Amino acid sequence: MEDKLKKAKIIFVVGGPGSGKGTQCEKIVQKYGYTHLSTGDLLRAEVSSGSSRGKMLSSIMEKGELVPLETVLDMLRDAMLAKVDSSNGFLIDGYPREVKQGEEFERKIAQPTLLLYVDAGPETMTQRLLKRGETSGRVDDNEETIKKRLETYYKATEPVISFYDKRGIVRKVNAEGSVDTVFSQVCTYLDSLK
């Protein structure tokens, strides 16, 4: 099983809040039959399952602490192993957030095939998030919070991008355009993997 993961197509999807990476991931799943894994979703699902790991996570998150990397990787690996036979590949969404996370992923799971960098400018991301805030009711979609989230994102992501860029596996997508324009760039990169 572990060997199958080493051979699987694994794509790290990195993009700021409001870059549209979630939408692009959905479209990739529909067209290419990849499995979309978001560490945030996995954590939330584990917590609501009420498992012993879920209870431990819940108490960590309630204190506002970061979930240990070890735990996140175990969950990712479990989720990938469960799907490795039925999936055409994996989209790992919002991971790695720092270089160490990427290195540990490779040590414990496998090497990424590509890092898809969904890149939109700060103005675009802010506008999209404010618009989403009008309809989503998400508390973190107001201008002040957005500014902080973008700063955090840039600080964390730049080293990750340059780490994988040195290996030549970063594919930058200009995410300023419409959903379909952006997706056609994504397809160019994914089609080249077949």
From Swiss-Prot:
Keywords linked to the UniProt accession: Acetylation, ATP-binding, Cytoplasm, Kinase, Nucleotide-binding, Phosphoprotein, Transferase
Which InterPro entries does UniProt cross-reference here? Adenylat/UMP-CMP_kin, Adenylat_kinase_CS, AK1, AK1/5, P-loop_NTPase
Cofactor entry: Mg(2+)
Q: Which GO terms describe its cellular component?
A: cytoplasm; cytosol; outer dense fiber; perinuclear region of cytoplasm; sarcomere; sperm flagellum
The question of whether rRNA processing is a record keyword is answered with no
Q: Where is the protein situated, by its record's location annotation?
A: Cytoplasm
Q: Where is this region: NMP?
A: 38-67
Q: Which SUPFAM superfamilies match?
A: P-loop containing nucleoside triphosphate hydrolases
Q: Where does ATP bind?
A: G18, S19, G20, K21, G22, T23, R132, G177
The protein's enzyme class:
transferase
Q: Which cysteines are joined by disulfide bonds?
A: none
Q: Which Pfam families match?
A: ADK
Record's subunit section:
Monomer.
Protein name, UniProt field: Adenylate kinase isoenzyme 1
Q: Which organism is it from?
A: Rattus norvegicus (Rat)
Gene behind this protein = Ak1
